[in-house]
A protein has these predicted regions:
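Short, Lys/Arg-enriched N-terminal segments with co-localized hydrophobic residues
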Residues: 1-3, 189
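Sec/Tat signal peptide C-region and signal peptidase I cleavage site
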Residues: 3, 18-24
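Bacterial N-terminal signal peptides
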Residues: 10-19
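Electrostatic cytochrome c docking/interface patches
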Residues: 25-49, 60-71, 79, 218-226
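The canonical Cys-X-X-Cys-His
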Residues: 51-62, 210
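Extracytoplasmic electron-transfer domains, predominantly the class I c-type cytochrome c fold
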Residues: 71-195, 204-208, 212-215
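Juxtamembrane amphipathic/hinge helix adjacent to a transmembrane helix
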Residues: 200-224, 228
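Juxtamembrane interface at the cytosolic side of transmembrane helices
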Residues: 225-230, 234-255
């Protein structure tokens, strides 16, 4: 009962956060296609490292256990040496480093669980992975906001830019258009104000790896499901052919 209650509360929080972001993105920019390849183990491993180092400080992934990372090629020892910061057992779930009470005091609400965030963000504009990929690449400095940051996909976002050291400071460039007496601001691109530790290409790749991992984390069995699904379709095709030929042989003399 407790587990089911926890699942329901987490999904409600995630969906509520997603609904807010969807409304905020209504007048925003088109979503970029995320480079999702859930069979790319190197990408998944790097994404897991970024997730633990940056996301797990405030967010949890309460329905994901560290030992499940064996599915992406990491041994228990590698997980212990490089990814265990909030617990000392690989069988534990991925809990946030921050105390929930502190998180609520600082942000006004507990940061949502990220286990299935890549699935809950899906909408008409693109997949959940597309949303996350664009969202994490469209932060910019805004001194009028409490956190000092804003976002093109999610205007007035409450979460600060946790990857800012990697990306650096950027400023969006808008072009003013007038139509039927109404002026609108159209996003044209970015101006790099302060360089980060990574080049734009390296940052995009890192975010792509992170989103790839989050897409895999939302359904760790998806690669197995797809692989088994191919064999099931092949079996059904062969079985259908055999059944058709057998049926023809049975009814040949009757006809």
């Amino acid at each position: 009962r407790t587990t089911m209650k926890k699942i329901i509360l987490t999904l409600v929080a995630a969906l509520g956060f997603a609904a807010g972001s969807a409304l905020a993105a209504g007048g925003g920019i088109p979503l970029d296609k995320a480079p999702v390849k859930t069979n790319d183990l190197a990408s998944l491993q790097n994404g897991a490292k970024v997730f633990v180092n940056y996301c797990l400080n405030c967010h949890s992934a309460a329905f994901m256990r560290f030992n499940r990372l064996k599915d992406i090629g990491l041994t228990d020892q590698q997980v212990k040496d490089n990814l265990l910061f909030t617990t000392d057992k690989v069988g534990e779930t991925m809990k946030a480093a921050i105390d929930p009470k502190q998180a609520k005091a600082w942000f006004g609400a507990n940061p949502p669980d990220l286990t299935v965030i890549a699935r809950s963000r899906a909408g008409a504009g693109g997949s959940g992975a597309d949303y996350l990929y664009t969202y994490l690449r469209t932060y910019y400095r805004d001194d009028t906001k409490p956190t000092g940051w804003n976002n093109l996909v999610f205007p007035n976002v409450g979460m600060p830019h946790v990857l800012w050291e990697l990306q650096g400071d950027r400023r969006p460039v808008f072009e003013e258009h007038e139509s039927h007496g109404h002026k609108t601001q159209v996003f044209k691109g970015w101006e790099q104000v302060k360089p980060g530790l990574m080049t734009p290409l390296q940052y995009d790749q890192t975010v792509g790896d992170l989103v790839n991992y989050m897409q895999w984390m939302a359904e760790p069995a998806q690669n197995t499901r797809k692989r088994v699904g191919v064999w099931v379709l092949i079996f059904l095709g062969v079985f259908t052919l055999i059944a058709w030929r057998l049926n023809a042989a049975f009814w040949k003399d009757v006809k």
